[in-house]
A protein has these predicted regions:
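Beta-lactamase-like hydrolase cores
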Residues: 134-173
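Active-site Gly/Thr loop motif
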Residues: 324-331, 379-442
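Active-site helix/loop module of the DD-peptidase/beta-lactamase fold
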Residues: 210-246, 276-281, 305-345, 372
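Structured C-terminal helix/loop/strand segments within mature extracytoplasmic catalytic/sensor domains
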Residues: 30, 422-471
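Conserved catalytic neighborhood of penicillin-recognizing serine enzymes
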Residues: 226-287, 294-297, 345-348
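Active-site-proximal alpha-helical segments within enzyme catalytic domains
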Residues: 201-202, 294-304, 341-363, 431-447
Length: 471
C-alpha cells in the first residue's frame, strides 16, 4: 500500500511539474489574452492618467473581470527604455507586456515582444492653449456650472449616473453647464473611450474626404484583397459595418476581437485576413450588418497610408483645432492607430468632440469635416435594420443607446422619450457621448460599468432633456 501511495504521489508531482512547464513554455491563448490585457490597461492608466498600478489592477482589471485576473501579477518598470509593464499568471506564466511610447501615443501591447518605431514629430505639442485656464470652455478650461437645482439633482442621482460613474459632463448652448466626477477622478483625468474611438476614426477619415485624399466609394483598400470579392468592399460599407467580412466581436473568450487586441502585433493585417462571409451578421439586424472592431482598425490603416506624417495627423487635423490637449491615441506594435478602441481624453475633451458633431463638423468658423458628412454619418444604415423595426447604426455612430436589460429584438429606447435626432458614441464598460442637435445638447457619461449591470444612460439623458425644457 505504501508503495502504491508513493507511486501515486510521484505521478501527482510529475503531473504538477508538467503542468507548470506547459504553463510557462506554451501557455494557452486565453492566458496570454488576459496577461496582455492586464499589462496594457495598467500601462495606459499609469502613464497616461497618473493612477497607481495597484488601484488599476484592483478596480479596472480584477474587480469587473474574469476570475483569471485574480491570479495575475503586474510589474511596472519606469526605468526601462522604453518604460514598460509586465504581467504574468501566478508570477511565471503567459508573460504579457506593454510599453510606453510617449506623450500623445500612450502605450502599446507587445504580444510578440517587438515594437515598430513611431514617434511624434517635433512641433506637435500637447500643451494647452495659452490662457486656457481663464477662457470659458470650449475655448479654454474655465467652467461656470449651472445653478439650476434640477440639473444638480439629476447629476447627484446615483441611479441616473449609474454604477461605477467616473465623469458626467453636460454641454448646453455650447457651454458646460454642469459636471460631476467619481472618487479619484476629475476634470484633468484622461479616460479610455473604448469603442467611442470608432467615431473619432470616422471623423479623421472625414477630414481626408474633405481634402480629396479619400473618397467614400473607394475600393481596392488592401493589396491582399486583389482578385477576391473583398476588392469590391468600399470605405462607405466599412463605415456602416456592412463589409461582409467574417468577424466575431465577442469578449468572453478568445474571439476575433480579443485575439486582435491582445495577441496580434499587426492588428490591421489580421483583420484584413478575414474571409468574405456576408452571411456572418448581427442577430439583431440584416445579415450584412456585423459590428467589427477589426473594421475600424483597418480604416486607421487606410487613412494612415493616405497622408504624409500620419503619426501627427490626428492632432493636426482634429485634436489641436478642437483644443483637445489631453487626447492620447494609442497604436499597435506595428505602429497603426487602434482606431477601434484606444483613445484616452478627459471628459471635457470628449465633450469637445461631441460638440463638433453637433455643429456638423464646424469649429470656430472653420469646417473640419465635409459639408453633409455628419448628416451622412447619422443617417440610418440600411444594413442595421432591427427586429423591432428601427435602425441601430449609422456610419460609425449609434442611433440608439445601450440595451441594458431590454431583450434582444425589442426597442432599447421604448421606455424613454428622447428626441428623434439623438445619436450616440458608445464604448465598452459604460462610455457614452450623447448628441442631440435639436436640443443643442451634448452629454458625456464615462465610468467602469460592465454590461451585466444593465445600466442605461438614456435615463440620465432623458431627465436632462426634460429639465432643460422646463418639463
Amino acid at each position: 500500500m505504501k508503495r502504491i501511495a508513493k507511486w501515486l504521489g510521484g505521478l501527482v508531482i510529475v503531473a504538477l511539474l508538467g503542468a507548470a512547464v506547459w504553463l510557462a513554455v506554451a501557455p494557452p491563448a486565453m492566458i496570454r489574452v488576459a496577461t496582455n490585457y492586464a499589462a496594457k490597461i495598467v500601462c495606459s492608466n499609469v502613464f497616461i492618467a497618473g493612477r497607481s498600478p495597484e488601484a488599476v489592477m484592483a478596480t479596472d482589471v480584477q474587480a469587473p473581470g474574469h476570475p483569471i485576473f485574480k491570479a495575475i501579477n503586474v510589474a511596472v518598470d519606469r526605468t526601462a527604455s522604453p518604460p514598460r509593464v509586465t504581467a504574468r499568471l501566478l508570477g511565471f506564466s503567459g508573460t504579457g507586456e506593454a510599453v510606453w511610447r510617449g506623450e500623445r501615443l500612450g502605450c502599446s501591447s507587445l504580444p510578440e515582444g517587438e515594437i515598430a518605431d513611431a514617434s511624434m514629430p517635433d512641433g506637435v505639442s500637447r500643451e494647452p492653449v495659452t490662457g486656457a485656464a481663464d477662457k470659458l470652455w470650449p475655448e479654454g478650461e474655465r467652467v461656470d456650472p449651472s445653478q439650476a437645482p434640477e440639473i444638480a439633482d439629476i447629476l447627484d442621482d446615483s441611479a441616473l449616473g449609474g454604477p461605477g460613474m467616473r465623469a458626467i459632463v453636460v454641454v448646453h448652448g455650447g457651454r458646460i453647464i454642469a459636471e460631476r466626477y467619481g472618487d479619484d477622478f476629475g476634470p484633468q483625468t484622461p479616460l479610455l473611450g473604448w469603442s467611442m474611438t470608432k467615431t473619432v476614426t470616422a471623423a479623421i477619415l472625414g477630414t481626408l474626404v474633405k481634402d480629396g485624399r479619400l473618397s467614400l466609394d473607394r475600393t481596392g483598400l488592401f493589396r491582399s484583397w486583389d482578385g477576391s470579392a473583398r476588392a469590391d468592399i468600399s470605405l462607405a460599407s466599412m463605415l456602416e459595418m456592412s463589409s461582409g467580412l467574417a468577424w466575431n466581436e465577442g469578449y468572453g473568450t478568445v474571439s476575433d476581437v480579443t485575439r486582435m487586441l491582445y495577441l496580434e502585433p499587426d492588428m490591421a493585417a489580421y483583420a484584413a485576413s478575414k474571409p468574405y462571409d456576408p452571411e456572418n451578421g448581427n442577430p439583431d439586424g440584416d445579415s450584412r450588418f456585423n459590428y467589427s472592431s477589426g473594421t475600424s482598425v483597418m480604416l486607421s490603416d487606410v487613412w494612415m497610408r493616405a497622408v504624409e506624417a500620419p503619426v501627427s495627423y490626428p492632432w493636426r487635423a482634429l485634436f489641436d483645432p478642437l483644443g483637445m490637449s489631453s487626447a492620447t491615441f494609442e497604436m499597435d506594435a506595428a505602429g497603426t492607430f487602434v482606431g477601434s478602441s484606444y483613445m484616452y481624453a478627459t471628459a471635457r475633451d470628449w465633450a469637445r468632440f461631441g460638440q463638433l458633431l453637433l455643429q456638423r463638423g464646424a469649429w470656430n468658423g472653420r469646417s473640419l469635416l465635409p459639408s453633409g458628412f455628419v448628416d451622412w454619418m447619422t443617417e440610418p444604415a440600411s444594413a442595421s435594420e432591427t427586429a423591432w423595426g428601427g435602425h441601430a447604426y449609422g456610419r460609425h455612430v449609434w442611433l440608439v443607446g445601450p440595451r441594458g436589460s431590454v431583450p434582444r429584438g425589442e426597442d432599447p429606447e421604448a421606455a424613454f422619450d428622447l428626441p428623434a435626432d439623438t445619436f450616440w458614441l458608445r464604448g465598452h464598460d459604460g462610455q457614452t457621448v450623447t448628441v442631440i442637435p435639436s436640443r443643442d445638447l451634448v452629454v458625456v457619461r464615462m465610468g467602469l460599468t460592465p454590461s451585466d449591470r444593465n445600466y442605461q444612460p438614456q435615463g440620465l439623458v432623458d431627465a436632462l432633456v426634460k429639465a432643460l425644457a422646463g418639463q
